[in-house]
């Protein structure tokens, strides 16, 4: 009985890693589409969001089956509960990639970016690292990695503050490009 449960937990971990890879790819492609103002790629990312939603449902179903059929002990129950919480957050990150893509489509008809997008690119890189490390921390049950992810969130917050400050200055200096700056702030917020 326990070996079947362990197999299902292993399957859960594999599905979590798979979903993480899907989201990482979605974020990466969304940022690339944004950088290059590529509306066609952005549309494809938005269409691909439903695959992430299906993966979330698959993982939630697996968690419910583990809870109902296996009656896990405390440690295993925490693992399953953590997976259910994480998968919801992961799906939301996937939604943010779709939101960035939506903004890319809106901004793709604009003139080339006059605002600095380097901090947004850095935020995306940090976010992808956080996602990878969070999944690793979950799978490995590694509290130290989880704490690193929490600290990394502060780095992303600092980058967002820099983006905000730069955009405020940019709008003051170039009010004619204020809308583009506002749109970039929305992208950074996602």
Where do the PLM segments sit?
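Cytosolic, long alpha-helical scaffolding segments
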Residues: 1-190
């Amino acid at each position: 009985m326990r070996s079947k449960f362990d197999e299902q937990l292993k399957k859960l971990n594999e599905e979590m890693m798979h979903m993480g890879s899907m989201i990482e790819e979605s974020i990466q492609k969304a940022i690339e589409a944004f950088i290059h103002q590529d509306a066609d790629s952005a549309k494809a990312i938005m269409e691909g969001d439903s695959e992430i939603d299906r993966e979330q449902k698959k993982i939630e179903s697996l968690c419910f089956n583990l809870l109902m059929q296996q009656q896990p002990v405390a440690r295993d129950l925490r693992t399953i509960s953590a997976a259910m919480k994480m998968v919801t957050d992961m799906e939301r990150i996937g939604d943010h990639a779709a939101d960035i893509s939506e903004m890319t489509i809106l901004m793709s008809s604009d003139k080339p970016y006059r605002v600095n997008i380097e901090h947004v690119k850095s935020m995306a890189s940090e976010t992808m690292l956080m996602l990878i490390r969070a999944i690793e921390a979950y799978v490995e049950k590694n509290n130290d990695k989880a704490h690193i992810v929490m600290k990394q969130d502060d780095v992303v917050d600092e980058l967002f503050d820099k983006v905000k400050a730069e955009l405020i200055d940019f709008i003051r200096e170039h009010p004619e490009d204020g809308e583009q700056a506002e749109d970039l702030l929305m992208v950074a917020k996602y």
